[in-house]
From Swiss-Prot:
Oligomer status and interactors: Homodimer. Heterodimer.
Annotated disulfide bonds: none
Protein name per its UniProtKB record: Fragile X messenger ribonucleoprotein 1 homolog
Record localization: Nucleus; Nucleus, Nucleolus; Chromosome, Centromere; Chromosome
Tissues and organs where the protein is expressed, per its UniProt entry: Expressed ubiquitously throughout the embryo. Shows tissue-specific expression in adults, being abundant in most neurons of the central nervous system (CNS) and in all spermatogenic cells of the testis.
């Protein structure tokens, strides 16, 4: 039951709305609506009850009515006694009776009501019952909510606890309330005692629960995940959250979806941090040099896929040059990794290691190229410049076991003969370069030979170059020697077996008496001069430069092992010009 409303008459004769707080012997204590006046005691004769609900009569001219109005702006509206003077449609002209001077006002029907039929209150209009409260229930009775059911059962409009007298005060307008209150008092106090006992137990249990929760949740982690990564953090059907909750020592995981904030509670710090690794998804950018992007990705994306698989990141993307979201550094391409913080850290370690490896390899290759360039420069400065183009030189630098003229193998003849001192050392670090040690011509010498991908590979000669070079020499084997060799169909003959040249050139030529016919093709551009009583000596230095010297027959025995004694050979056809005295021919030019 709500508070009991009454109407209190003021000094001006108007009735103001108020509420009963307590009942005394000859007065009641009331509080006014909106607290426009302080709480005070009002005598019974100045108090009346409001009219019954639904009480309303037809209002006619000359009827006494009550008008809901106010005397000034400081006071609330109240009910004033008045009389209807005229009715025009919905408007009523009324005259106030409480005023000394006649005062008329035009009002509507909403502000009018019939005169309140209730008389002023008396001592018997209100009933008050006091019940002593046991000592153990005093604290319980101080709560108004504890008497809600009892108040409804006895029909009282107010049940309150008097802390000064330790009494339960019951107020009512019905006399039957006194009887019901006395009848239900023992039962009410017993139920209060039971409720109090249960409430104390629940309160103690709540305290223990709160204490346990605080103890269990003394470790707390809080972090925010980007809104576009919340789906990855939660996982399919909340799989990641369930996995984090299964971590031993984690007591609770809360998610604030509005702020995308995770709260993790646990018994120890390690459990909380481990659960965080399952839920904290982020995005990180790693800058990769543009010239290494292809090597980082690998063929068909094999290398970058290996990094993704081993690190555990969800995905990686390579930003386009025109992407405005990420401003790449100059000469760098951004690789964007998406995943947990732990997986991104692993991906960063793998990628940094691979980038350092690629940079070291490039540095080693650059150093090797610089060394090779210096070696080529040293080799070029240590030998005289050639008088003929490289294509006219007398040996192949690219294929040591190449064929002679007529595409036949050298078969250990001439310059292709390999002695016991021959050694070869090929470096495979770079296929463009090979280092070969040749036998003595006349002494051992090391050469750097550039591969087919280099510029020096243009120095290799073709079969036609061999053919032209043979025509530069005016020496040929004797007729007896030609019988020992296989005769070619084109009339060309292979040189003697004991010459130092690769094709039988440069052998010792004796002073033969009988001329022999020579049907070989001669090169009219270059002719070799010789004396009538001299011999030709061919020398090849370390730079592959050939020189022809004429010597007398007496000096032939001095050469020893260097020049072999040839058999009787038919003297070549005498040349038109005979040079008097020794003449030196270098590279076929006198």
């Amino acid at each position: 039951m709500e508070e009991l409303a009454v109407e209190v008459r003021g000094s001006n004769g108007a009735f103001y709305k108020a509420f009963v707080k307590d009942v005394h012997e000859d007065s009641i204590t009331v509080t006014f609506e909106n607290n426009w006046q302080q709480e005070r005691q009002i005598p019974f004769h100045d108090v009346r009850f409001p009219p019954p609900s639904g009480y309303n009569k037809d209002i006619n001219e000359s009827d006494e009515v009550e008008v809901y109005s106010r005397a000034n702006e400081k006071e609330p509206c109240c009910w004033w006694l008045a009389k209807v003077r005229m009715i025009k449609g919905e408007f009523y002209v009324i005259e106030y009776a409480a005023c000394d001077a006649t005062y008329n006002e035009i009002v509507t029907i909403e502000r009018l009501r019939s005169v309140n039929p209730n008389k002023p209150a008396t001592k018997n209009s209100f009933h008050k019952v006091k019940l002593d409260v046991p000592e153990d229930l005093r604290q319980m009775c101080a709560k108004d909510s504890a008497h809600k059911d009892f108040k409804k059962a006895v029909g009282a409009f107010s049940v309150s606890y008097d802390s000064e007298n330790y009494q339960l005060v019951i107020l009512s307008v019905n006399e039957v309330t006194i009887k019901r209150a006395n009848m239900l008092s023992d039962m009410h106090f017993r139920s209060l005692r039971t409720k109090l006992s249960l409430m104390l137990r629940n309160e103690e249990a709540s305290k223990q629960l709160e204490s346990s929760r605080q103890l269990a949740s003394r470790f707390h982690e809080q972090f925010i995940v980007r809104e576009d990564l919340m789906g990855l953090a939660i996982g399919t059907h909340g799989a990641n959250i369930q996995q984090a909750r299964k971590v031993p020592g984690v007591t609770a995981i809360d998610l604030d979806e509005d702020t995308c904030t995770f709260h993790i509670y646990g018994e120890d710090q390690e459990a909380v941090k481990k659960a965080r690794t399952y839920l904290e998804f982020a995005e990180d950018v790693i800058q990769v040099p543009r010239n290494l992007v292809g090597k980082v990705i690998g063929k068909n994306g094999k290398l970058i896929q290996e990094i993704v698989d081993k690190s555990g990141v969800v995905r990686v993307r390579i930003e386009a040059e025109n992407d405005k979201n990420i401003s790449p550094e100059e000469g760098m391409v951004p690789f964007v990794f998406v995943g947990t913080k732990d997986s991104i850290t692993n991906a960063t370690v793998l990628l940094d290691y691979h980038l350092n490896y690629l940079k070291e390899v490039d540095q080693l290759r650059l150093e090797r190229l610089q060394i090779d360039e210096q070696l080529r420069q040293i080799g070029a400065s240590s030998r005289p410049p050639p008088n003929r183009p490289d294509k006219e030189k007398g040996y192949q630098s690219e294929d040591l076991s190449g064929t002679g003229r007529g595409s036949r193998p050298y078969n250990n003849r001439g310059r292709s003969r390999r002695g016991t001192g021959y050694a070869s050392d090929i470096r495979y670090g770079d296929p463009d370069y090979r280092k070969t040690t040749y036998p003595e011509y006349p002494r051992s010498q090391a050469f750097w030979i550039k591969g087919t991908n280099s510029e020096a590979s243009n120095a290799s000669e073709t079969e036609s170059d061999h053919r032209d070079e043979l025509s530069d020499w005016s020496l040929a084997p004797a007729e007896d020697d030609r019988d020992n060799y296989h005769r070619r169909g084109d009339g060309r003959r292979r040189g003697g077996p004991r010459g130092q040249g690769m094709r039988g050139r440069g052998g010792f030529k004796g002073n033969d008496d009988q001329p022999r016919p020579d049907n070989r093709q001669r090169n009219s551009r270059e002719t070799k001069a010789r004396t009538s009583d001299g011999s030709l000596q061919i020398r090849i230095d370390c730079n592959n430069e050939r020189s022809v010297h004429t010597k007398t027959l007496q000096n032939a025995s001095v050469e020893g092992s260097r020049l072999r004694t040839g058999k009787d050979r038919v003297q070549k056809k005498e040349k038109s010009e005979v040079v008097d005295g020794p003449q030196v021919v270098v590279n076929g030019i006198p």
